């Protein structure tokens, strides 16, 4: 009887953990498609003004001229 009780409790914990992780995965997928994501962000083309490398489409900003190269 003790063995059956332990197996039952283990199965309940595994089911709960699986359901919980599924909910978290959906939330994580939603966050990765956020507008701030690198894949959906807008960028400045070559020759446009920039302050840092991550603003340029090719990810290179000239510090001397403050333009994307």
UniProtKB/Swiss-Prot annotation:
<keyword id="KW-0800">Toxin</keyword>
<keyword id="KW-0732">Signal</keyword>
<feature type="disulfide bond">
    <location>
        <begin position="43"/>
        <end position="57"/>
    </location>
</feature>
<feature type="disulfide bond">
    <location>
        <begin position="56"/>
        <end position="68"/>
    </location>
</feature>
<dbReference type="InterPro" id="IPR004214">
    <property type="entry name" value="Conotoxin"/>
</dbReference>
<dbReference type="GO" id="GO:0005576">
    <property type="term" value="C:extracellular region"/>
</dbReference>
<protein>
    <recommendedName>
        <fullName>Conotoxin Eb6.14</fullName>
    </recommendedName>
</protein>
<keyword id="KW-0960">Knottin</keyword>
<feature type="signal peptide">
    <location>
        <begin position="1"/>
        <end position="17"/>
    </location>
</feature>
<feature type="propeptide">
    <location>
        <begin position="18"/>
        <end position="41"/>
    </location>
</feature>
<keyword id="KW-0964">Secreted</keyword>
<dbReference type="GO" id="GO:0008200">
    <property type="term" value="F:ion channel inhibitor activity"/>
</dbReference>
<feature type="disulfide bond">
    <location>
        <begin position="50"/>
        <end position="61"/>
    </location>
</feature>
<dbReference type="GO" id="GO:0090729">
    <property type="term" value="F:toxin activity"/>
</dbReference>
<dbReference type="Pfam" id="PF02950">
    <property type="entry name" value="Conotoxin"/>
</dbReference>
<keyword id="KW-1015">Disulfide bond</keyword>
<comment type="similarity">
    <text>Belongs to the conotoxin O1 superfamily.</text>
</comment>
